[in-house]
Structures are given as C-alpha cells and as structure tokens.
Amino acid sequence: MIMRTVRNQPRTTREDLVNDLKAAGTIVTKKTIGNTLRREGLKSCSARKVPLLKKTHIQARLKFANEHLNDSEENWVKVLWSDETKIELFGINSTRRVWRRRNAAYDPKNSIPTIKHGGGNIMLWGCFSAKGTGQLHRIKGTMDGAMYRQILGENLLPSARALKKGRGWVFQHDNDPKHTAKATKEWLKKKHIKVLEWPSQSPDLNPIENLWRELKVRVAKRQPRNLNDLEKICKEEWDKILPEMCANLVANYKKRLTSVIANKGFATKY
C-alpha cells in the first residue's frame, strides 16, 4: 500500500501514510514508513518548479522537438538565443555561511544586510550564440513593446555583428506578448531578421537558461552591495563566460529535443 500510494501520488507525506494505514487497521510510525521508502530507493526531495503546461503547450513542444530532431548542429549554430531574467540582490547570498564565535551572530561581519522584499532586483535582457555571449542590457522600469524594440535595436543587431553572424542567422525569443506584438513582428521583418518559431512555456528548450544559472552563481560569489553594483558585476561576469561553454550548449542541443520527446512533451531536466 505504501509504495502504491507514493507511486501514484509522490506528494503524499509520511503523516498521510500513517493516517491511511491507521484507517485500514495497521499502526505504523513515520520512521518506519521513511525506512521502508528508503529501502525502495526513494528519498524525500524538494519538488522542482516547472512551467504550468496545458495540453496545447505539450503538443506544441512535441511538434517542435520532432520537427527539429534531425536538424544538423550547423542549424543551431546559426541561432542567436535570447531571454530576460531577474537577478535578486540578496537572493543566493542570503544563505551564505560564516565562521563566527557564539553570540556573535549579529556582528556586521557575520550578517548579510537585507531590506524588506529581499533588497530589490534587476531585470536583464541578454543573448548568446555558439560563438559566445552577446550584449547584456539592464531593463529599467516596466518593459512594453516599444521598449523591447528599442532594446533589440540597441543590443540585438550589435550582438549579431560582434558574434559574426553571417547571412541566414536566426533569432530566438519566446512568445511573450511584447515579442509577438504586431509592431515587433513588423520591426523584425523590416530588419530582415528571421525568427525561430517557438513553443510557449519552454524555458528548458532555451540553452540561455544554463547561462543565467551560471551568471547568478558567479554574481553571488562577488556579493554585490547595491543594485548599481549588481548591474556592473552582472555585465563583468557575463563577459567572462567562455565561448567554449556557449559552443557546448549549442552542440548538445539535440539532447534537449530527445528529452522532450522521451518525456512526452512535459518539462525536462534542462
């Protein structure tokens, strides 16, 4: 009963199982249940947060993966990947450990200053290709379609030139309404920029997510003091990401597609 319940409902707690078994006439402790599950190779883990996928999203993801499964690596080399991300000032730093004496927890050297709501954050737009990272831009205020097009004008085209994107390069962005707005589509068409058709709710198909994680780890180690410092450090660390890392992400892109297919369209480890 224990294994059957957990297989069908992985979020079941040990207390739930104790109560279910008690109702069925069997008395066991939470410790016994925990030991039983561990013997079966199961352990309690934090549930991963993934985008909410509706049936249409799953179908679109499978369609994308199957249509591009046999694309050559050269096809993906042509792509300039982009995305936005939020970076918290005291996000990762808030769990930093320190060596201190007893009763010295609140010494300034042993604590991390925070303010209400986490100390603030900055929004960034960035892009990369197999040849390396492109420009990184801080988004100030609420981004609308006009601001997005301005960001593209000031950052996308210069990035494409710097990364030596030749004829036939392809631009990737997700299906945010600002990205798919009529004015944005017309702007891209006017600039003769080909856009990769993209399935919604699919950050795991965008390799830039790996670079965002890398950036956040690097930034946290430098312990920025304020938002301006955070922006400066983000740009410095973004520029330090090696082209080899970018090339490797693109070279292994097919693995993302096979994972989506193997997972029947649902979210993957990427």
Q: Which residue stretches match the model-derived regions?
A:
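Acidic/histidine-rich, metal-coordinating catalytic segments
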Residues: 82-84, 165-179, 205-206
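Basic, flexible linker segments flanking DNA-binding modules
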Residues: 36-68, 100-101
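A short, amphipathic alpha-helix used for macromolecular contacts
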Residues: 1-35, 63-77
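C-terminal anion-handling pockets and recognition modules
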Residues: 75-79, 85, 208-270
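Extended, low-complexity cationic-aromatic segments
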Residues: 58-157, 263-264
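Acidic, Ser/Thr-rich intrinsically disordered and amphipathic helical segments
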Residues: 1, 16, 27, 32, ...
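RNase H-like polynucleotidyl transferase catalytic core
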Residues: 46-49, 111-112, 171-175, 191-210
